[in-house]
Regions:
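ATP-dependent helicase/translocase motor core
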Residues: 2-293
Length: 293
């Protein structure tokens, strides 16, 4: 019981941070639709609140089957183009054209764009039962407007398990053929996390899954320094995954390198921590001091 409590405490700490100052709301695992791998309640809430005119067109087209009709169209587009494309370009279900995400305008002067940006709904859902075949659950799934963007498997060294166990769990116990875990069409990144280190992958591939460190580095070495948060890895949820940051990553930093001849060789590139940090510091410096210095 003590071990279980320590694991749950770690999970709750992440949830609390994202809910309290990360710009998220709490998702309900019962709203997760295993057939389509989306949070249908938040998906339709986002569409209706942010684009009522386009939603009305969908209702006129599909009638009483509007939700099912749109889910089928969404499924096809995600299968064909992928999650990153859908976030950036939206869904056309003629005559309706729906944005699935609104990115932050370059200037706060555009009040309409800013208002739409604020309509985004980021949510954190714990213990998501994702499979139609079994009752396996993932510790944490993050959603943007009901669409899954990231998973987290958490371990606490205080229980005798580390980030290596989280990686092993992804490789051995998480079937990449499951829709939520499928490359390109659903989650964009998967994090293996403990209280000391973070590792990531954009493509689950069984025992061949390749993880990259997502650590800050510690005095020129590997790992993470002691920070201001509760854990050495608190920067992940206190900084990287907070609302503005995650939406910015989806908009500007993730890159899908497709191999049309051999799709299995396609690669999703998610920035390492230091890459993200350097680019953002450079951009902030330009905004503050201008170019040409």
């Amino acid at each position: 019981m003590a071990i279980e409590t320590k694991e749950i405490t770690f999970e709750r700490e992440i949830e609390y941070s994202l809910l309290d100052h990360g710009g998220y709301i709490k998702g309900n695992p019962r709203d997760y639709n295993r057939e389509f791998a989306v949070d249908t309640k938040l998906l339709f809430r986002f569409l209706q609140e942010s684009q009522p005119a386009e939603w009305a067109k969908l209702c006129k087209k599909h009638g009483d089957d509007v939700e099912t009709g749109f889910l089928k169209k969404l499924y096809r587009d995600l299968d064909t183009h992928g999650m990153l494309y859908v976030f950036r370009h939206g869904i056309v279900d003629a005559p309706a054209k729906l944005s699935m995400c609104f990115f932050k305008p370059a200037s706060g002067m555009n009040q309409t764009s800013q208002a739409l940006y604020e309509k985004n709904i980021l949510s954190i859902t714990r213990q998501v039962h994702y499979s139609l075949k079994n009752e396996n659950s993932i510790d944490v799934v993050l959603f943007i407007n009901g669409l899954p963007v990231a998973t987290l498997e958490l371990k606490n060294p205080a229980t005798g398990q580390t980030v290596e166990n989280a990686k092993h769990q992804y490789m051995k116990d998480r079937d990449p053929r499951e829709l939520l875990l499928s490359f390109k069409s659903r989650c964009l990144v998967h994090f293996a996390v403990d209280t000391d280190e973070v590792w990531m992958t954009t493509k689950l591939d069984g025992i061949n899954t390749y993880f990259l460190p997502f650590n800050k580095g510690n005095n020129g070495g590997k790992g993470n320094p002691v920070g201001s948060g509760t854990y050495r890895t608190s920067y992940l949820w206190d900084e990287v995954l907070q609302k503005d940051s995650l939406l910015d990553i989806v908009q500007r930093f993730i890159h899908l390198q497709e191999d049309k001849k051999n799709p299995k060789k396609s690669v999703m590139i998610f920035p390492r921590y230091h890459q993200l940090d350097v680019v953002r510091k450079l951009v902030a410096d330009v905004y503050e001091h201008g170019t040409g210095r």
